[in-house]
Amino acid sequence: NRPRLRANSDGVEIRNINGTRFYPWEVIYGMSFPEGSRMARIELPNFEYVPVWAIQSGDKEAAIAATRNFRELEAKYMPLD
C-alpha cells in the first residue's frame, strides 16, 4: 500500500510503510516540515511525532500543495485549546 494522509472532521489517518493509524484532532498539535527533513510530520503530545511518508520534500510542488491543504483542514477542525 502506498503512503497516504487523510483528514476529516474526526481526525487524521496516516498510512505509512509500517501500517495505518488514526489520530483524533484532540491529540494533534499540528504538522511540521523541519528544515532539512525528508518528510512532513504530525506533532503529538509529549514531544512525539508521526512521520508522514505521503508528503516528502522530493515531491516539491505536490508536497507544498498537500501541506497547504492539510493546514486548511487543521484550521477548520483542530480544537483551539
Per-region residue spans from a language model:
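Short acidic, Gly/Pro-enriched loop/turn segments at secondary-structure junctions
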Residues: 35-42
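A membrane-cytosol interface segment of integral membrane proteins
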Residues: 42-81
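Generic beta-strand structural signal
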Residues: 7, 33-35
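Conserved beta-hairpin
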Residues: 1-25
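Bulky hydrophobic/aromatic packing residues
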Residues: 23-25, 39, 74
